[in-house]
């Protein structure tokens, strides 16, 4: 069963283990359903982390791939150029 982990790579490895287990076909139905639910939950968590990372990169890089300058007084928002 999936456990709460903060590390993206660990969660991705756990999801891969679940997929491998389910693909083997040697899992009782009830266990397969539990594993599937855990996999869906992990998949959603990973997707959220990827979306968050993508948004962070978008804030730091303009459409041409150049780094944006951050306003030191408001480090979370890039300066307008």
Swiss-Prot record:
Its EC number is 3.1.11.6. One of its GO terms (biological process) is DNA catabolic process. One of its GO terms (molecular function) is exodeoxyribonuclease VII activity. It is found in: Cytoplasm. It comes from the Bacteria. Residues 59-81 are annotated as: Disordered. Gene3D superfamilies: Exonuclease VII, small subunit. It catalyses: Exonucleolytic cleavage in either 5'- to 3'- or 3'- to 5'-direction to yield nucleoside 5'-phosphates. Residues 71-81 have a biased composition (Polar residues). Keywords: Cytoplasm, Exonuclease, Hydrolase, Nuclease. Residues 60-70 have a biased composition (Basic and acidic residues). The keyword Isomerase does not apply. Heterooligomer composed of large and small subunits. Bidirectionally degrades single-stranded DNA into large acid-insoluble oligonucleotides, which are then degraded further into small acid-soluble oligonucleotides. PANTHER family: EXODEOXYRIBONUCLEASE 7 SMALL SUBUNIT. This is Exodeoxyribonuclease 7 small subunit. It comes from Lactobacillus gasseri (strain ATCC 33323 / DSM 20243 / BCRC 14619 / CIP 102991 / JCM 1131 / KCTC 3163 / NCIMB 11718 / NCTC 13722 / AM63). The gene is xseB.
């Amino acid at each position: 069963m999936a456990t709460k982990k903060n590390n993206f790579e660990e969660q991705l490895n756990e999801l891969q283990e679940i997929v491998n287990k389910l693909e083997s076909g040697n899992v009782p139905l009830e266990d397969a359903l539990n594993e599937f639910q855990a996999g869906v939950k992990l998949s959603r968590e990973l997707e959220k982390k990827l979306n968050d990372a993508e948004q962070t990169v978008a804030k730091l890089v303009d459409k041409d791939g150049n780094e944006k300058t951050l306003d030191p007084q408001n480090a979370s928002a890039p300066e307008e150029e």
